[in-house]
């Protein structure tokens, strides 16, 4: 008998069905409801059915908070799936402007491709700065002895001040940065030429050249050089990486506008003499 018991125990140990992972096969089949397999399938489907019902209820009764959040989203955060032709054209032109301006900034740094001529380009750009022109006009006005010369210089000074104030105001409104990250210099802060749009040097160069061509008697070579100077001043700002191409183009247009405004409100000789007397604290011409 003990030998038979040891044999039966050995058989039970070697039986595969006695392992823990196969214990469910030894359980009897439960009757009713289409069998145990049907119940297990039914119980397996119940969570998914509940989730579907919950989703349907949430779809029928949307939460007002989510709707409020969606309504409160700004238009900047929304994706424009169907942008207008005007928007596509503007974005394309801006991308071309930025790309070409970056490539033309060959004198932006000393290590650039044209870094050897950077000092000459900076000197050319300095000739269109507002501070030298304003102080130079004041010095010439103090040394002028003729009424006609003083009349021209006073109107030129007013044109320069108008250009500086208008360009600085537009730059602070737009606040566009240049194609290359460069901090403005000391003279730029004095002339309030901090941002990129519009190009102050280009506007001033066009206005001054147009003014001098209209009110000074110059030879043909000098007139040609004056026009080339205005164009090269605008190009130099692009080569230095300070402005985009559109900044310079708008600066040229703004310079023509300033010249037209000065011609419309041209101050007479008597008015200029009055302003000179007020500025020099010489009140005798007023009486």
UniProtKB/Swiss-Prot annotation:
Residue segments, region Disordered: 1-75
Chief location: nucleus
Extracellular side: 142-146, 237-247
Biased composition (Gly residues): 31-40
Keyword DNA-binding in annotation: no
Topology term for the membrane: Multi-pass membrane protein
Keywords for the protein's UniProt record, in alphabetical order: Endoplasmic reticulum, Membrane, Nucleus, Transmembrane, Transmembrane helix
Cystine pairs: none
InterPro entries registered for this protein in UniProt: P_Acid_Pase_2/haloperoxi_sf (IPR036938), P_Acid_Pase_2/haloperoxidase (IPR000326)
Cytoplasmic side: 1-120, 168-215, 269-287
Cellular component GO terms held in the UniProt record: endoplasmic reticulum membrane; membrane; nuclear envelope
CDD domains for this protein: PAP2_containing_2_like
Coiled-coil stretches noted in the UniProt entry, renumbered to this chain: none
Transmembrane segments: 121-141, 147-167, 216-236, 248-268
Database matches in Pfam families: PAP2 (PF01569)
GO molecular function: sphingosine-1-phosphate phosphatase activity
Location in or out of the cell: Nucleus envelope; Endoplasmic reticulum membrane; Membrane
PANTHER family given in the database record: INACTIVE PHOSPHOLIPID PHOSPHATASE 7, SPHINGOSINE-1-PHOSPHATE PHOSPHOHYDROLASE
Similarity comment text for this entry: Belongs to the PA-phosphatase related phosphoesterase family.
Role played: Plays a role as negative regulator of myoblast differentiation, in part through effects on MTOR signaling. Has no detectable enzymatic activity.
The protein's name: Inactive phospholipid phosphatase 7
Source organism (scientific name): Danio rerio (Zebrafish)
């Amino acid at each position: 008998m003990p030998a038979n018991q040891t044999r039966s125990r050995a058989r039970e140990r070697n039986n595969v069905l006695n392992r823990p992972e196969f214990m469910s096969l030894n359980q009897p089949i439960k009757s009713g409801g289409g069998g145990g397999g049907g119940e297990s399938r039914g119980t397996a489907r119940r969570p998914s059915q509940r989730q579907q019902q919950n989703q349907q209820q949430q779809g029928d009764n949307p939460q007002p908070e989510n709707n409020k959040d969606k309504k409160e989203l700004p238009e900047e955060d929304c994706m424009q799936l169907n942008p207008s032709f005007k928007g596509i054209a503007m974005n394309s032109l801006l991308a071309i402007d930025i790309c070409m301006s970056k490539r033309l900034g060959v004198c932006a740094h000393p290590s650039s491709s044209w870094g050897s001529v950077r000092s000459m380009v900076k000197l050319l750009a300095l000739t269109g700065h507002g501070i030298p022109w304003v102080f130079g006009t004041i010095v010439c006005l103090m040394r002028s002895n003729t009424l006609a010369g003083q009349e021209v210089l006073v109107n030129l000074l007013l044109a320069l001040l108008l250009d500086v104030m208008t360009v600085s105001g537009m730059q602070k409104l737009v606040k566009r940065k240049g194609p290359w990250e460069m901090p403005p210099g000391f003279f730029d802060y004095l002339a309030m030429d901090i941002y990129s749009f519009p190009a102050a040097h280009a506007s001033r160069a066009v206005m001054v050249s147009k003014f001098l061509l209209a009110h000074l008697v110059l030879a043909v070579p000098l007139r040609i050089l004056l026009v080339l100077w205005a164009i090269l001043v605008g190009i130099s700002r692009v080569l230095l990486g300070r402005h985009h191409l559109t900044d310079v183009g708008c600066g040229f247009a703004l310079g023509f506008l300033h010249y037209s405004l000065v011609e419309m409100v041209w101050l007479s000789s008597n008015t200029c003499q009055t302003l000179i007397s007020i500025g020099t604290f010489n009140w005798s011409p007023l009486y």
